[in-house]
């Protein structure tokens, strides 16, 4: 993956996520990322594009603090989400705060309805059924097609609809 600059595009105060000049090493010797920086403005959308093996997934794993599971580590630079260093937070805490990685695969439960797929995991929430229902309606605002297909069996929806469901579930 190449970067145009090692400096973030927006100012740190404007960004919900800042990755500043990070290096990632696996097994204490294999350098897989060097000098990667990016900044995601609050309310913005950012895409990581690159060839196979360019470091997109490794960058996402670093942001999600998931590298240790694969004997990887950030050895240089900083990753800050909502004003806090990612390395100081557990992956579960990052998810609770809204830093969620949606993988390329769709990972829907084909035998469940679209809506049941969206509600997967909601049972672990502690903020009540009304908040869950409000979040579901927000997903339907972002993805009106899912509301139309909410009673359809997820396994019979298009790939794009399944990806919308994966994003909505996150």
Whereabouts are the PLM-identified features?
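Conserved ABC ATPase signature
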Residues: 153-157, 161
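ABC-type ATPase nucleotide-binding domains, specifically the catalytic core motifs of the NBD
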Residues: 27-28, 46, 67-70, 114-134, ...
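Conserved ABC ATPase "signature" region
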Residues: 8, 84, 130-149
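Short beta-strand immediately N-terminal to the Walker A/P-loop
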Residues: 46-47, 101
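ABC ATPase NBD Q-loop/coupling interface
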Residues: 66-67, 78-96, 124-128
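Short coil-to-helix segment of the ABC ATPase nucleotide-binding domain corresponding to the Q-loop/switch region
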Residues: 60, 111-121, 150-151
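The feature captures the beta-strand-to-loop junction immediately N-terminal to the Walker
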Residues: 49-54
